[in-house]
Regions:
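Extracytoplasmic/secreted envelope proteins and their assembly/folding machinery
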Residues: 32-35, 56, 82, 93, ...
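Second-shell loop/turn segments in exported
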Residues: 81-89, 135-140
Length: 157
């Protein structure tokens, strides 16, 4: 009888585990919370200023308007910046990620040719571009350890 109880319990556990379904979608980043944490992390050497919301799509080359966005750019003519975008869905976020990657590539190519701020070239080459759910994050900074601590340390929703 004891063996039968153990066997039935094991079968019930296997059946319940099979009903688990798909893993949840990755949580996105909250633009306000994440941008504040990044700005306070010490990751940036240059003074940053928030970009007007109506300029975000044109600045980053986005096809679709984000539902929410926080974008900061360098006031010093440098390339340090951060952007956290909330898009309508994961497909729109994937398209936004592609546009953001193209934005970083264009800036890298420009700096390689012009050498206006050569000290920023390594920052551009190490830029962080991530998609989490329906959000996209871009960070061009001086301290990527600080960036990683924020993005990997629980600032996601």
């Amino acid at each position: 009888m004891k063996k039968l109880t153990v066997l039935l319990t094991a079968l019930a556990l296997v059946a319940l585990a099979a009903c688990g379904g798909k893993a949840p979608a990755p949580a996105g980043y909250d633009p306000e919370t994440t941008s504040k944490a990044l700005l306070e992390s010490g990751a940036f050497e240059q003074e940053l200023s928030q970009l007007d919301a109506d300029m975000v799509s044109a600045y980053l080359g986005l096809e679709d308007e984000p539902e929410a966005a926080v974008v900061y750019t360098s006031l010093e003519g440098g390339y340090e910046e951060l952007a956290i975008l909330t898009m309508a869905d994961e497909d729109a976020a994937a398209a936004a990620k592609t546009a953001v990657e193209a934005h970083v590539t264009a800036q890298t190519e420009t700096e390689t040719e012009v050498q206006y701020k050569p000290e920023d070239l390594p920052k551009l080459k190490d830029a962080v571009v991530r998609q989490a759910g329906n959000t996209v994050v871009l960070v061009v900074a001086a301290d990527y350890d600080a960036v990683g601590a924020v993005l990997d340390g629980g600032s996601a929703e």
